[in-house]
Amino acid sequence: KTVFSWSMYDFANQPFTTLIVTFIFSAYYTQAIAPDIHNGTFLWSIGIAITALFVAFISPLMGALADQGGYRKILLIFWSWICILSTIFLFFTYEGQIYIALFWFVIANIGFEMGSVFCNAYLPHIAPKDKIGRISGYGWSLGYVGGLIALMISLFLFVQPHKPIFNLKKNSSINNIPV
């Protein structure tokens, strides 16, 4: 039960990277929010780099806190909420808001990455030493399943419908994602 619960974090969390970082919002940012695809791709890359640098510098400190044990759960929840709330703000960005959208993306991506630090810190405590690799792979595979399900739902309900879902106008940000 504990291993399944731990794995479900990946199932629920992986759609962020699938939808926001890789397929849907990244395309929307580079092709609709940014003035052109070249500037959009450049700025998106800058956002990824900022996230990577921040995570590289702060992860050792956060990892030490996670290893202490007492902060693991509260910081997992904290960083997860940072990701969730920042991702919600992405919904409200539209054409021309290149820096606002990039700001919320970077904050959300940092929240995602730092949440992963604390999720991963649980693994040695829930898995026997000889099964850590197998259990880690189980979580990883459930993450991919979650990401694929979220991608299919997004494509069929939001990106490619002939009639917009939830009565959203066809040119609203959620239905204006180029694929």
Regions found by a protein language model. Give the residues of each.
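Hydrophobic core of transmembrane alpha-helices in multi-pass small-molecule transporters
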Residues: 80-118, 122
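Transmembrane alpha-helix termini and helix-breaking/packing motifs in multi-pass membrane transporters
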Residues: 22-33, 147-179
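Helix-to-coil boundary motifs at intracellular loop junctions of multi-pass secondary transporters
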Residues: 32, 68-69, 122-126
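Cytoplasmic membrane-interface "Motif A"-like loop-to-helix N-cap segments
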Residues: 66-82
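Central cavity-lining transmembrane alpha-helices of secondary-active solute carriers
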Residues: 20, 24, 41-65, 85-86, ...
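Helix-loop boundary and gating motifs at the non-cytosolic
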Residues: 1-52, 98-102
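Glycine-rich segments within core transmembrane alpha-helices of 12-TM secondary carriers
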Residues: 113, 133-159
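Loop-to-transmembrane helix entry/capping segments in MFS-fold secondary transporters
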Residues: 38-42, 129-140
